[in-house]
């Protein structure tokens, strides 16, 4: 959520910054917010004036009674004032609701370093690591090779549940688990993150705090009776861990890593990546979340991105890092990097991690603040997060990049201790 004071102070600057955001966002809502805000402030002045008048009239009553004067006129006027105040308070409540409704739907302001552009084709490549894998034979897609090796079963998952679900079997299940443990151990032991194991269901306030609601409710799986949501990412519960709290400035930056299953309806993605592990309704992910002071946040974003890159380098998977343009930035981020791994079956790089700085956009929604000293005025933290990284897509990348001519898969060295010493899937 944006700072209303900032909108009030620089409305044209805000509208210019949000133009071309790629969110089908109508900048005229900024004018609507300002109109409501002005009405609200005028009503507050009027209410204060009426309350002062009521107080003055009320103060006359004891003296009138002492002097034996009739107070009926004063009581009638006070009743009339109370009625006016009640009506104005009701209007204030309506305005507050309207302002909140609009503010929750205004996207974040892009950082000045965000490239201009309308789609992912306009994202800017920052760097690459490794060379795109080439073969002296015709490589197979992971969905074919995984089935051939009996480590992935899409057909039976479709029978048991439906499309976009998978059974991992045998060494496939063990490979998935190995990737999870390798990622967690590296981020905890080498990068200094504290592990969190979060709930897989959250309430509506949590989904609103991180920005999934109200805009993206159709993408979420909801339990109607409880009004709980299956988490689309561990970002939601881990960020909301400190909702409505004031953190100690001396504890910042705080760094958390969390493994979780993630659940997404993938509304609007019909026909996209329908085969394999790339776009599933349920998938595993290791998430990195940071809480920082404002002046630290962009340095910490670079570190977070490097941490995500580091685990991919350890596996030897070729990747590139791109800076996301305005039109592809998404709703909540101020600046975002995508890490994309090379996928031979697609003959292109495929996103495996998004690393974002939300500045104070989420912390305003979730009311997460910090202060240096007990008597200091609290300020909003900056929140950051990134996949560290998506596990199913990692498995897909391993299968495709490390496949051999005989249909076997070489297991990356970093994973072998988690695989009982095995070095090949056959």
Curated annotation (Swiss-Prot):
Protein name per the record: Serine--tRNA ligase
NCBIfam families with a match to the protein in the record: serS
PROSITE patterns: AA_TRNA_LIGASE_II
Keyword Ligase part of the UniProt annotation: yes
Binding-site list for L-serine: 233-235, 287, 387
Entry keyword set: Aminoacyl-tRNA synthetase, ATP-binding, Cytoplasm, Ligase, Nucleotide-binding, Protein biosynthesis
Subcellular compartments: Cytoplasm
Pathway stated in the Swiss-Prot or TrEMBL entry: Aminoacyl-tRNA biosynthesis; selenocysteinyl-tRNA(Sec) biosynthesis; L-seryl-tRNA(Sec) from L-serine and tRNA(Sec): step 1/1
Gene name for this UniProt entry: serS
Species name: Clostridium tetani (strain Massachusetts / E88)
Pfam families documented for this protein: Seryl_tRNA_N (PF02403), tRNA-synt_2b (PF00587)
Tagged with keyword Nucleotide-binding: yes
Residues the entry annotates as binding ATP: 264-266, 351-354
Record's catalysed reaction(s): tRNA(Ser) + L-serine + ATP = L-seryl-tRNA(Ser) + AMP + diphosphate + H(+); tRNA(Sec) + L-serine + ATP = L-seryl-tRNA(Sec) + AMP + diphosphate + H(+)
CDD domains found in the cross-reference section: SerRS_core (cd00770)
HAMAP family in the record: Ser_tRNA_synth_type1 (MF_00176)
Top-rank lineage group of the source organism: Bacteria
Cited function: Catalyzes the attachment of serine to tRNA(Ser). Is also able to aminoacylate tRNA(Sec) with serine, to form the misacylated tRNA L-seryl-tRNA(Sec), which will be further converted into selenocysteinyl-tRNA(Sec).
Listed EC numbers: 6.1.1.11
GO cellular component: cytoplasm
GO biological process terms held by the UniProt record: selenocysteine biosynthetic process; seryl-tRNA aminoacylation
Family affiliation: Belongs to the class-II aminoacyl-tRNA synthetase family. Type-1 seryl-tRNA synthetase subfamily.
GO molecular function, one term: transferase activity
């Amino acid at each position: 959520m944006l700072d209303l004071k900032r909108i009030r102070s620089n409305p044209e600057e805000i509208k210019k910054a949000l133009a071309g955001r790629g969110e089908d966002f109508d900048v005229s809502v900024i004018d609507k917010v300002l109109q409501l805000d002005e009405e609200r402030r005028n009503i507050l002045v009027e209410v204060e004036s009426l309350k002062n008048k009521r107080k003055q009239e009320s103060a006359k009553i004891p003296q009138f009674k002492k002097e034996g004067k009739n107070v009926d006129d004063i009581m009638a006027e006070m009743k009339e004032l109370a009625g006016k105040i009640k009506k104005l308070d009701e209007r204030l409540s309506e305005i507050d609701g309207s302002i909140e409704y609009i503010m929750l739907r205004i996207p974040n302001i892009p950082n000045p370093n965000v490239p201009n552009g309308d789609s992912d084709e306009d994202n800017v490549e920052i760097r690459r690591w490794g060379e795109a894998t080439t073969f002296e034979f015709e490589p197979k897609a992971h969905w074919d090779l995984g089935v051939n090796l009996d480590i992935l079963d899409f057909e039976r998952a479709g029978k048991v549940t439906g499309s976009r679900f998978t059974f991992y079997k045998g060494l496939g299940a063990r490979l998935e688990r190995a990737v999870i443990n390798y990622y967690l151990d590296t981020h905890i032991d080498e990068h200094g993150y504290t592990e969190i194991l979060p709930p897989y269901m959250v309430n509506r306030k949590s989904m609103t705090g991180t920005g999934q609601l109200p805009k993206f409710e159709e993408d979420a799986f909801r339990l109607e009776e409880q009004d709980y949501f299956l988490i689309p990412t561990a970002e939601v519960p881990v960020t909301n861990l400190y909702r409505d709290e004031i953190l100690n400035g001396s504890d910042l930056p705080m760094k958390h890593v969390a493994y979780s299953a993630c659940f997404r309806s993938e509304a609007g993605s019909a026909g996209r990546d329908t085969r394999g592990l790339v776009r599933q309704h349920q998938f595993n992910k290791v998430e990195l979340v940071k809480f920082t002071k404002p002046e630290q946040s962009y340095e910490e974003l670079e570190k977070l991105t490097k941490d995500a890159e580091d685990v991919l380098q350890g596996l030897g998977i070729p990747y590139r890092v791109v800076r996301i343009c305005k039109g592809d930035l998404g709703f909540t981020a101020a600046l975002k990097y995508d890490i994309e791994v090379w996928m031979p079956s697609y003959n292109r790089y495929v996103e495996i991690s998004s690393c974002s700085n939300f500045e104070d956009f989420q912390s305003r929604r979730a009311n997460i603040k910090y202060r240096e000293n007990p008597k200091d005025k609290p300020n909003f933290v900056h929140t950051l997060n990134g996949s560290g990284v998506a596990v199913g897509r990692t498995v897909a990348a391993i299968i495709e990049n490390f496949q051999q001519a005989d249909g076997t898969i070489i297991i990356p060295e970093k994973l072998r201790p988690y695989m009982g010493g095995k070095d090949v899937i056959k």
